[in-house]
Amino acid sequence: MSRFIISSHSPNEEGNVVRVTPESAGWEYVGFEVYALTKGQTLRKETIDQEACLVLLKGKANIHTRHERWENIGLRMDVFEKIPPYSVYVPSNDVYEVQALTDLELAVCLAPGKGTYPARLIPPSEVGVEMRGAGNIERRIHNILPESKPADSLLVVEVFTPEGNWSSYPPHKHDQHNLPHESYLEETYYHQINPDHGFMVQRVYTDDRSIDETMVVKNGDVVLVPKGYHPVSAPPGYEGYYLNVMAGPVRTWKFRNDPDHEWVMESKLAAKQK
């Protein structure tokens, strides 16, 4: 298996099914966890020196922090309903407690925090929805925690790729601290597939090909993108979902397309406008 794939496993005692830490990934900023909680199960964590974005992938919950309480939040029961999710932002040096009111799949997105902003609910109405691309590179975007919304480090977005389409395309990268042209951001992809016995294909490669891996990705896999371009393809018959977490030294998303393939977007958009 590729060193960039972290596969999920059966839930442990606290419900964790996958965990990525900066130490395990060999980088500095991004952490990511998923919990599969049964109805009535409670998860309690301290954020310490990290901020967190709790994304209710499916199911309903009560979520409490040190100073806030949100009761009976959650709307979708499957990510492929394509309804924007409920999420909760939790600053560093705080505590969160999640009580599952139904079976619950919870993503915990982590990055260094400074405690600048208070805990807050991110309801579906505050999630920006857009269609990006055109033709067979069109995909649906839910901007959960974009750079226009307050946080110290985290950027969080989910993407739906129709069957037979590509996303994160044209291939782009953000691995150089070269503002305003490009920002350095580590990134994780948490994949789900409908139907769940299918697969996605993701390539991670650099200009010099010191990294060049094409991976078959299963439902529940996390793909690490430490650097390089990272396009995704959904085979016919299977639609893809992924949750992206990004963080780096500066909280801005500035990317560079692979110049060999940048023409594709221009061509697709021109065809769409005809």
UniProtKB/Swiss-Prot annotation:
InterPro entries: Deoxy-glucuronate_isom_IolB, IolB_Bacilli, KduI/IolB_isomerase, RmlC-like_jellyroll, RmlC_Cupin_sf. Its EC number is 5.3.1.30. It is an enzyme of class 5 (isomerase). GO terms for biological process: inositol catabolic process. Pfam families: KduI. Pathway: Polyol metabolism; myo-inositol degradation into acetyl-CoA; acetyl-CoA from myo-inositol: step 4/7. The keyword Isomerase applies. Gene3D superfamilies: Jelly Rolls. One of its GO terms (molecular function) is 5-deoxy-D-glucuronate isomerase activity. PANTHER family: 5-DEOXY-GLUCURONATE ISOMERASE. NCBIfam families: myo_inos_iolB. HAMAP family: IolB. Involved in the isomerization of 5-deoxy-glucuronate (5DG) to 5-dehydro-2-deoxy-D-gluconate (DKG or 2-deoxy-5-keto-D-gluconate). Belongs to the isomerase IolB family. This is 5-deoxy-glucuronate isomerase. The lineage of its organism: Bacteria, Bacillati, Bacillota, Bacilli, Bacillales. The gene is iolB.
